[in-house]
């Protein structure tokens, strides 16, 4: 099983530009001396992770989770988990539950300790603020900063202009405050159909930043909400909800990926108008952008991932080939390895592509120190030791972990008939081949030195069994074991005692490092050999593996007992990653 220990080269406090910003704010006392509604002092650093519950989180979200929760931890602050649940058509409690589970699995908590020593949860939903958001929208209308537009979505898009042409003002832009208020209230009352009206901010239709050309703040959507039911038929847009939620929760540093950089002026515009109306007061939260995580040989588009699931090109959202967090967890990745990966990737201001080998290297480095060892024969060939007594067996032993003697030894039997890897025998070996061939001696790892004496073949000339004799005084760990020198060492399991297991060999899901770049059809890049299911023979103790126990199968790589399909006494194993980097091949 796995043995917990943090990866030694993890550096959660690595310097980045966001830490520099926070350090400057702390030095200037920007957020010092604040209090919550109960008069309790607020931390000087409060971040948040605000996913929309419309899908499963993927490896790209892990970077944001580690960043937001990690900064809050390192600066003695807190991080909120907030669900941006403003689009009832796409959201579901299934996704809410999966996100909560994923953040917990990564090792983070949104609880803080109250003055009475009790944990204070900081789990929020944008829908918690629907009443306040509506009231704040009316405030903007009363200030002449928002209006109800009766154009269609197509007309609004057509009149927005482009980078070289200014937008055209809506013919409804100059409605009176009274008319706008009445229309907005009628929208809430359900008097209009979807798309009949929207509420827009009144900013500048000639703004160089197209985001600022009277963006939509509210739209009509007659849809059942997973938390508020049918109470609302109008819903706020992300840009309106996001900044207000931050302010209501006393967020200090609102961290977003780079695609939201052009939205930052709107973030500030909404909060400044509400501050000037007396709703909020300084210091307001501030938005900062960082580069998103782009991983080679993967896609993270929710729409495209859903297509893979819907078309049954993968075995669900938790398929071990998927980049979803439920997928990489089932693959056998550890939370610590993902945190290590995020630390190694770092935080930058410009988008870049991260090679898959960086992720797999982090997994490999983490598991090397924690995974118990075991022996597995994946492509079996029978080996018969002719001079070993029939019906007899003896114990061999090996360390549970070669660098952790305190974990003790594992014991497994050796008998007359063994399984070895087919690639460890070659009847006509090439130069430099030191494993088993007729007349050659090798060591059975943890066992005896043997000499190959012959082979059995089927009618087609295929080798179906190898014969050998063993040298009795050469057993590993006994006096004189090294009296016979050999160059080759092979692994094995006793045929009579081995655990016959289903093993799934996973590889990259795509053959193309950028499967959906440049207008490609990402489906064309699917790797037809990304999953192979085999029957393997394992040392008998592995039969007791529990779901999510991780092992290094010696000479093969790292494997995990599948968390979904394993049953007591019958674990199914997934290959997590090989022993060496395979991405440069």
Swiss-Prot record:
The organism's place on the tree of life at top rank: Bacteria
Keyword Glycoprotein in record: no
Motif 'HIGH' region location, chain numbering: 51-61
GO molecular function: ATP binding; glutamine-tRNA ligase activity
Binding site for ATP: 52-54, 58-64, 257, 292-293
Binding site for L-glutamine: 84, 238
Catalytic EC class: ligase
Pfam families registered for this protein in UniProt: tRNA-synt_1c, tRNA-synt_1c_C, tRNA-synt_1c_C2
Aminoacyl-tRNA synthetase is among the record's keywords: yes
SUPFAM superfamilies from the UniProt entry: Nucleotidylyl transferase (SSF52374), Ribosomal protein L25-like (SSF50715)
HAMAP family xrefs: Gln_tRNA_synth
Membership in a protein family: Belongs to the class-I aminoacyl-tRNA synthetase family.
Annotated protein name in UniProt: Glutamine--tRNA ligase
Species for this entry: Cupriavidus taiwanensis (strain DSM 17343 / BCRC 17206 / CCUG 44338 / CIP 107171 / LMG 19424 / R1)
